[in-house]
Amino acid sequence: MNALYKKNFLKLSDFTSLDIRNIINIACILKYQKKNKNEFPYLKNKNIVLIFEKQSTRTRCAFEIASFDQGAQVTYLGPGSTHLGYKESIQDTARVLSSIYDGIQYRGHNHETIKNLAKYSNVPVWNGLTEKFHPTQILADLLTIYETLPEKSFCNIKCAYVGDARNNISNTLLEASSLLGLNLCLVAPKCFWPNYDFFLKCQLKAKKNHGNIICTEDIQKGVRGADFIYTDVWVSMGEPKKTWHNRIKLLKKYQVNLKMLLLTQNKKIKVLHCLPSFHDKNTIVGEEIINKHNLDNGIEITNQVFNSQSDVIFRQSENRLHTIKALLLSTLLKEFPYI
C-alpha cells in the first residue's frame, strides 16, 4: 500500500524527507507529461472540496487544475459560503464533508481550525495556507530549487530568507531545512525572528541532515554565498495600517535590491518570491504604500530585481500546479501507479 494514502498534510514535517523527495520526483514526471499532453487521469471519480476562508489566486487555480487534469471533480467553498465554526462546528463539518468527498483542502486564518478538521475527517486534509504554515508553497519552491540547481544536493545549497522571518513561509522553510538539510539563513531584525523553541528544534534536525540554520540582522553576512534569496510581502490585507507603517519602517533596509544581490558575491544568484509582490505601483495597495512611505522602486523587492528574476519567480508559481498534483496522487491513491 502507498505509505501516504489518506495522510494529512498540515505542515511539511507531517511527511518524511523521503516522502518529500518522492513528491518532488513525481511532480517532475507529471510536469513533463503535462507539457507533452500525455497525462493519465488517475483521480477519475474522485471528489475534492476546497475551503477558502481567505481569498486566493495561485492556490485555488493550482488545486483546481491539478484536480481537473487528473480527472477529479472539485467543489469550491469561498469566503463566507460555509457555516464553519459559526453555525456548524468544525467537528460536524469535517464529518459531513468527509462522508461526501475524498479530500479536503483548507486555506484560512487559524491553524487550529485545520488541525480540528483533520482530527474529525476520514479523508486527507491539505493545508493551502494558515497563519503558521504554507506547505504547498514550499513544495513548489523545493521543486524550483531542484530544477534550478539539479547538480547540487539540498545540503550544498544556501537560501537566504530576507524580511519578516516569523511568517508562514519562513516557518515552513525552517521545516524544509530540518528535513532536507537545506542551508537556511533568516535575515531580519531581531523582533522579526521566529519562535525560539521552534527555531532551535528545526536547527538541531537540520544539523542531523548535514544542513545549517542561522538567524542574523547582518544583511551582508546573511546573503553572502547564497544560491537563492527568498522574500515575501511585509504586510497582509486585513492588518491595521498602523501595523503597516511600523513594519515597513523596521524592514525598509531589508528590501531585495541590486545592492543586496551584489552582496551575495554570486553572479548566478536567483531570487524567489511566493507572490503576490509589491514591486511596483500597478496595484491599489502597492501604490498607496509606496507613495505614503516614500519607498524607492517597490516595497519588499525592487521592480528591477523582480523583472530580472521573473523567470524563476513565475516558474515557482507554475510549479504549485505540479507539486499539488503529486500531493493529490500521493494521498488519494491506495496503490501508487507506475508513471
UniProtKB/Swiss-Prot annotation:
It is found in: Cytoplasm. Its main location: cytoplasm. It is an enzyme of class 2 (transferase). Pathway: Amino-acid biosynthesis; L-arginine biosynthesis; L-arginine from L-ornithine and carbamoyl phosphate: step 1/3. PROSITE patterns: CARBAMOYLTRANSFERASE. It catalyses: carbamoyl phosphate + L-ornithine = L-citrulline + phosphate + H(+). Keywords: Amino-acid biosynthesis, Arginine biosynthesis, Cytoplasm, Transferase. One of its GO terms (molecular function) is ornithine carbamoyltransferase activity. Carbamoyl phosphate binds at S56, T57, R58, T59, R107, H134, P135, T136, Q137, C274, L275, R320. Reversibly catalyzes the transfer of the carbamoyl group from carbamoyl phosphate (CP) to the N(epsilon) atom of ornithine (ORN) to produce L-citrulline. Belongs to the aspartate/ornithine carbamoyltransferase superfamily. OTCase family. This is Ornithine carbamoyltransferase. It comes from Buchnera aphidicola subsp. Baizongia pistaciae (strain Bp). The gene is argI.
